Amino acid sequence: MEQQAPAILVISHGFFCRELVNSVKMVFGDVARLESLPLEEGMDPEVYEEQLNQLIDSYDGNVFVCVDIMGGTPFKSLAKAARTRCLYGVAGVSMPMLIEVLSDRDEMCGKELAAQAASVCRDMIMDLSEYMEKMHKIGLGE
């Protein structure tokens, strides 16, 4: 029996993850097995860690996790969860990255998915200064 595509969990400080998921749904429509877990201000890190473990377990560990930044509480909670589970994911989640992950999750294993998402997103970061200057000149009629 073929394994189901992984659930995608987006975790972050504050409600960034929730709103990122909402924004991606504007592009994809309703997406199955896509969840967010915000670390709310003042939340006990142990409570957050427990919520993350429960969410991972609700998908039998078949998850791919997108985290906002390395080193913060969501990341540390994920690192602890990975001690007892085989997990894959990426840090530095953005809308292009999440779109890439959702587009490829049916065709790639977790390790490949992480490498692909990181690679594509490196190419998505660009300096728009030259482009904006060109647009400004067009606006001025130059």
Residue ranges and their predicted role:
Residues M1-C66, M70-E142:
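N-terminal loops that bind phosphate or other acidic moieties
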